[in-house]
Amino acid sequence: ISGSGTAAASAMGSIIGPIEEEEGYDRDFSAAANIATAPTGLLIPPSNVMITYSLVSGGTSVAALFMAGYIPGILWGLACMAVIFYFAKKKGYRSTKKYSNSEKVKVFFQAIPCLLMIVIVIGGIISGIFTATEGSVVAVVYSLILSLFFYKSIKFSELPKIFLDSAEMTGIIIFLIGVSSIMSWVMAFTGIPTAVSEAMLGISNNRYVILFIINILLLIIGTFMDMTPACLIFTPIFLPICQALGMNTVHF
């Protein structure tokens, strides 16, 4: 729902972290679990990074990217669940509060309106009712209505600050896109993507070897650079290499 790993980690960490501490979980374990599961926020659509990649890659279908994110996101989530369950059992963590079946049903029905946003946004984009950009507007309006009138988690007096924070974040993203576009043009003008492509293809023309090398490089890059600028800067370098090997832009 958040569309961002950072947003998912921040939101869930602030909510789940204190609860886990009350239940007796180690802070290290809680932090590790939160960080490890955060990437599902950008893998399972809607995802802002996928929209950014669609822009940089020359118009890759956003709907196709969204659909391609479901299986990796679900597999990542299941893998995290299995590992966390194993270590929770090993360390003897137990939930001190038990919930009745009626409470579980009540919470489930309370969550349905929020979960419906995924169905509305993704369904609308895939069916062609609205574009990805229009889908983001639908998501904002729908979540605003839920927050104000259904869940009542925010007040009207808080809206100005929320709008200002959103405008600030949008301005930062637009600035990053502008600067990264200039850098991409400079790299294309100086022939850097071609040089990198020739160097990597000189190592191997096996697509799996090339993908392995790219993943290692992106792993290193990701330790000091945020996802959005990394996507904007390095997609124009690595994507032509994969296209030369016949890879689909969605797969990349």
Question: Locations of the language-model features?
Answer:
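Alpha-helical transmembrane segments of multi-pass membrane transport proteins
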Residues: 1-252
